[in-house]
Amino acid sequence: MVAPLSSFFTSATIVRGIKEHLGLSTRSCKRQAAIGRDAADIGMPQRSGLHATNERNDGVMNKTPTIQNGLGTLIITGSSGLIGSAFLDRVGESYTEMGFDRKGPPHPPPKTEHVIACDLSSDESVYAALDEVRRLGHRRIASILHLAAYYSFASESSPLYEQVTVRGTERLLLGLRDFEVEQFIFASTMLVHAPCEPGERIDEDWPLGPKWDYPKSKVTAEQLILRERGDVPVVLMRIGGVYDDRCHSIPLTQQIKRIYEKRFIGRIFSGDITHGVTFVHMEDMVEALVLAVEHRKELPHVTTLLIGESETLSYDELQRAISRQLHGKEWTTYQIPKPLAKLGCWLQSLLPGADPFLKPWMIDLSDDHYEFDISRARTLLGWEPRHTLRKSLPTIINGLKSDPAGWYQENKLRTKTIPDQ
């Protein structure tokens, strides 16, 4: 009986970094993740680790020329995911891309010539993948785009956050020590920050305050990267909720679905309806990655960036905009007490055909508000989002109205709940 959807969007994929993308191993280590302060802010000392290339401008390496000569080698983890696929579409054949991912079903192969099987939860698999990069003659890496991570709304916590997101990052960093690496980009999330109040704007120095295992694992991974990076420049991208013209945002999809099906649950909310979260369109997200790679030589050695739209729609504004597009009229959203919402959510889960997305633990997050100050990304990258969720909603909704079954299937919704037209 609650719709706390807009309270904790990510990069999905980053935003859909679920374990089927990663080929998880049962041999994963299960050490406890520790959440500490932001190492970027406290000047954590560097240890001997990855080696930055010393030949950034001489063009000596003929086998893997630098990007300045027209090609450069990129390693993209999670390359068959939504963000990875969109990035590969964007860069085309400009670079030599090494896609680290699971080969075969259930996902189509990444759109790159070199697809290398890599299970981040396995030491052997990660090192074998890097050995294959070496065998292909690529010792000098222009940029590592580390997009793969574990992510799921199924539960508040999971050992896979530690095994994949944290220890998988550690395996990758250790394996890269034999390479010359010009840049390491880590896809993090806005949820590492404590929420703000409407009218305030979160910047990169805003206090940390992750509330569940997904953002907690990102904080731990960020700090691990800063400890183990050696002299390799790193970019920590803290990303808003990623969506595209077909939606592909789990919480946003669920919100649209409830209003489309005219469910009563779509009219109630356990949080402050004047609060909302930051989104970013996939094309703008990818552009930020491209610009970070292109500007890697001018960026500080440790760069934290918030990537999201400047405008944050409140939950109520989003409800009204969706209902106008779907039904030609605005819905009124009613706020209910959190204890009642948790009880209703639990009772609903016992019913046949219950909404599998809503969980009682989400209700405590429903008041969270995220609004970005993106001036650092503007200054360092020259990045400016060209899309807004407000202007993109008509395209998203029209896609649903023109082909409900296809839209449901593409967004992994149960088609049996589609209302009769």
Spans of features found by a protein language model:
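N-terminal Rossmann NAD(P)H-binding glycine-rich loop of SDR-like oxidoreductase domains
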Residues: 74-92
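Mid/C-terminal beta-alpha module of Rossmann-like enzyme folds, strongest
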Residues: 291-357, 374, 390, 394-395, ...
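Amphipathic terminal alpha-helices
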Residues: 62-67, 372-380, 384-421
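NAD(P)-dependent short-chain dehydrogenase/reductase
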Residues: 228-277, 282-284, 291, 322
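Conserved Rossmann-fold NAD(P)-dependent oxidoreductase catalytic core, especially the SDR/UDP-sugar
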Residues: 171-213, 235
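Conserved C-terminal active-site "lid" loop/helix of NAD(P)H-dependent oxidoreductases
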Residues: 282, 344-384
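NAD(P)H-binding glycine-rich loop region in Rossmannoid oxidoreductase-like domains
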Residues: 120-164
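Active-site Tyr-X1-5-Lys
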Residues: 211-235
